[in-house]
Amino acid sequence: QNSPERVDLTWFDNHCHLGDDAEDVIARARVAGVSGMVNVGTDLEGSRAAIALARSHPDVWATVGVHPHEARHGMDGIAELLGDDTVVAVGEAGLDHHYDFSPRRQQADVFAAQIALANERSMPLVIHTREAWEETFAALDVEGVPARTVFHCFTGGVDEAGACLGRGALLSFSGIVTFGAADDLRAAAAACPLDRAMVETDSPYLAPVPHRGRANEPAYVALVGAAVAAAMGRDVAEVATATSANARRFYGLDQDS
């Protein structure tokens, strides 16, 4: 019953990056039972492209934001895009102290600006944090945690999960939850209340086992969900239903859209 190939289940991929092959990828996702996808902006150009794609697909929504890698380019033009009907969140925004592609001062400033935007607009905030847990929590505590906040591609353990959940945030689990070495992450999933969990692919990155190392796509989100269900000790169908409902509620989507 818990086979991830069950096509009677519907899933919601709440974080992906759709590229030039988006039409084919979206079509395959629908066949695989994916009822919706949030296509995430990482800079001004990418956010504009995400909006354009979402306008032509009723089951695709966009976010607008500046990824920490792109923080050196600033925030120009971002706020103006938030009013589009297809835009459901600010982000992905945050801190990446692993790569440091942008100076940390600029990362911090751009993250703070996006937390403030989410609060001003009463919009969800999508967070990217890597090797910067304490700094990320500190920024949120200073600016105020938006009422709807998600830690995308959550990679922490039980302690980090508690710190996120304690701030009212949701955790979004990616294909990493299927990786052999990810015991700490599975422990975090087991500790996460079902109403605070979402699933994502982060396509085209982080393909779940057995596709690891190849291009990822939203059609594979069921593999992520099955691994989360196993970690939680819950039925896959229950996790599919709950994470989809959580995503629609989090992003403010109508149930019939």
Question: Which residue ranges define each predicted feature?
Answer:
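Mid-domain alpha/beta scaffold segments of enzyme catalytic cores
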Residues: 1-257
